[in-house]
Amino acid sequence: LKTTATPDGDGFRINGSKIFTTHGQFADVFLAYVRYGPGVGGIGSVLIERGQDGFKTGNPVKFMSGEEWVQLYFDDAYVGPENVLLGEGGFKKQIAGFNVERIGNTARSLALGRYAFEIARDYAATREQFGRTLNEFQGLQWKFAEMKVKLDAAELLLYRAACNSDGGFPSAEETSIAKLYCNTAGFEVANEAMQIMGGAGFSEDCLIEYCVRRTRGWMIAGGSLEMMKNRIAESVFERRFSQRPPRPETK
């Protein structure tokens, strides 16, 4: 994080940029994380209003899921004290809310996988091949059984993370496990549903193709699956691991 907040009177001057602001072309107010100083303790956040001096947004760029994002640019943009959301050291408090966001991410990914499953199930019950419906073929029956197990197991992990909240926030460990499994299951089930339906599932006339694209995005958004694995490993070994390269020794 390189966007800086430099003191200027009662407020701050913001310089830097922020990428991947989803639907930012429609927003009037933006939340941006900034660096007041070094390290995690130096991170906070401010509110920036569209149209103010020193602030602009880039042209929209489309994600594979169909959503669009813009980049934010700060060139000595002034933020008054009333627009400082979190001062220096505040990021440690706000980061607890990420687990809540990840629960929502997880639920949406799972819902898309289940929706794709239901579309493919109904298709297999009515589509005929070689004189009988697709669900009469044992190979496809096994596919649906495996998809059902993945969805139900993912749902239980999601409920565990949501219900076992401590002080209003899900635990980082259970949230990471749920996100890792549900994101993976949601995509795999949607992808398998498309395979079962063949060309019909690959068509934009069928919502399964959207489910595949969107569930793939959830495997990145809100913390990549690799980040979730890192967090789970820390719980396994009951210690923190730094993924950063060692700093060179100073003389």
What spans do the regions from the language model cover?
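Internal mixed beta-strand/loop scaffold within catalytic domains of large alpha/beta enzymes
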Residues: 3-17, 21
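Flexible, small-/acidic-enriched active-site or ligand-binding loops
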Residues: 51-78
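Alpha-helical interface subdomain recognition
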Residues: 7-12, 73, 96-251
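Short polar/acidic secondary-structure junctions
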Residues: 6, 36-39, 62-64
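A short core secondary-structure module
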Residues: 15-56
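A short, charged helix-loop
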Residues: 70-96
